[in-house]
């Protein structure tokens, strides 16, 4: 949620309320989770608190709190500190999203997934310690440039496909891939963030509607059960938006957008190359089983010809 802003005309679907009080699982003696991915607690197991961080400039503002650039004072680790207000989350009934985000993201290790290190809380707030992505939101970059060229878009497609394949192998569906939830690292590499809508699959093949209207697949609009193939549809929409500058089914009316999605009313401007059209058309299929698999996305001729992905050095990214 770095550099988060409300985006029009997109509409975020309201999650179901009534999930009970906020239950962030904490060790009462430490206020910090243990396990993989954490910013290590001091050797004396001192409770983490806001006093352990130097707080810098705000990186973004969201409905439930803000994100700040911060540095852990002892370890000198630069991170993004996401500050969420408990009362606001309880009021909106989204505590389950926080628990889900912590549960899922803390176990994910991939160069194109934003790292979740740790969390702690006080009486009124929950603090999430996240990897800092210095180049911010992809959406801001898209606003700045209008659209991306084939090389940049193909690079993003390879990165997001590799990250999602990793998620799907771990039975995690993201369900909310969109430029606002994709951050950019030091080298401009894509980082999937905001796992609040994610679910473990296949045990939770839900019919609930979530995500952003322009990115919703037909099966979710039509109320059918869905699986990891919703993410295939989303990256097809993402590819189109990166190349064109707006989503493929966007209209001024929600009802008309729904209709265009369910009919897969896909129209390409002349600026979209044949290779990109082929890839997008193979992802934006009404039938989930007909959508191009992630491995085939990474091996698609247009992606192979245009992607400039650079893998990071193979070394531990754990702070010491």
Swiss-Prot record:
The keyword Signal does not apply. One of its GO terms (biological process) is midbody abscission. It is found in: Nucleus; Chromosome; Chromosome, Centromere; Cytoplasm, Cytoskeleton, Spindle. It comes from the Eukaryota. Keywords: ATP-binding, Centromere, Chromosome, Chromosome partition, Cytoplasm, Cytoskeleton, Developmental protein, Kinase, Nucleotide-binding, Nucleus, Serine/threonine-protein kinase, Transferase. The active site is at residue 176. Residues 1-10 have a biased composition (Basic and acidic residues). It is an enzyme of class 2 (transferase). GO terms for cellular component: centrosome; chromosome passenger complex; cytoplasm; kinetochore; midbody; nucleus; spindle microtubule; spindle midzone. InterPro entries: Aur-like (IPR030616), Kinase-like_dom_sf (IPR011009), Prot_kinase_dom (IPR000719), Protein_kinase_ATP_BS (IPR017441), Ser/Thr_kinase_AS (IPR008271). Residues 1-38 are annotated as: Disordered. Its EC number is 2.7.11.1. It catalyses: L-seryl-[protein] + ATP = O-phospho-L-seryl-[protein] + ADP + H(+); L-threonyl-[protein] + ATP = O-phospho-L-threonyl-[protein] + ADP + H(+). It holds the Pfam family Pkinase. Kinase activity is stimulated by cell-cycle specific phosphorylation. Disruption phenotype: Embryos show severe brain necrosis. CDD domains: STKc_Aurora-B_like. One of its GO terms (molecular function) is ATP binding. Residues 53-303 form the Protein kinase domain. PANTHER family: SERINE/THREONINE-PROTEIN KINASE IAL-RELATED. Serine/threonine-protein kinase component of the chromosomal passenger complex (CPC), a complex that acts as a key regulator of mitosis. The CPC complex has essential functions at the centromere in ensuring correct chromosome alignment and segregation and is required for chromatin-induced microtubule stabilization and spindle assembly. Involved in the bipolar attachment of spindle microtubules to kinetochores and is a key regulator for the onset of cytokinesis during mitosis. Required for central/midzone spindle assembly and cleavage furrow formation. Component of the chromosomal passenger complex (CPC). Belongs to the protein kinase superfamily. Ser/Thr protein kinase family. Aurora subfamily. This is Aurora kinase B. It comes from Danio rerio.
